[in-house]
Amino acid sequence: MNNKVGIVHSLKDGQKYMDIWPMRKELNPLFPEQRVIKATRFAIKVMPAVAAISVLTQMVFANTQAMPQAIVVALFAMSLPLQGIWWLGHRANTQLPPALASWYRELYMKIVETGFALEPIKSKPRYKELAQVLNRAFRQLDDTALERWF
């Protein structure tokens, strides 16, 4: 697969990746995804208000000289959630390093051994496939099966 994808595709993948990544404390030391997802969700909620306040305060005080700076601040505030979603989309389409790919295969085989159906294993897995397998593992495997990895 071509790793160079458009910005719109990356944003869509980022939103999907944000939904499928398991938000588990065991994964915090290993992956930055949980921190990025939390920051991005916070930015989605807060940054539109920051953008509006930065422009509206200049309008209320009739400070036309500071309006260009307020607009730049508003644009920057509005870009922060997009940057987080773009990063997640880019990360979702990145191939796993060899160590993580073998970990993905082990976890995949463990899930299949316990009798759960998964989509076919990927020869060159990406982070989004790892997220799907991790999500399934945390939902369907018991704690004793997960002890080896966490």
Curated annotation (Swiss-Prot):
The keyword Repeat does not apply. It is a multi-pass membrane protein. InterPro entries: UPF0208. It holds the Pfam family DUF412. The keyword Transmembrane applies. Keywords: Cell inner membrane, Cell membrane, Membrane, Transmembrane, Transmembrane helix. Its main location: membrane. It comes from the Bacteria. GO terms for cellular component: plasma membrane. It is found in: Cell inner membrane. The chain crosses the membrane at residues 42-62, 70-90. Belongs to the UPF0208 family. HAMAP family: UPF0208. This is UPF0208 membrane protein VC_1099. It comes from Vibrio cholerae serotype O1 (strain ATCC 39315 / El Tor Inaba N16961).
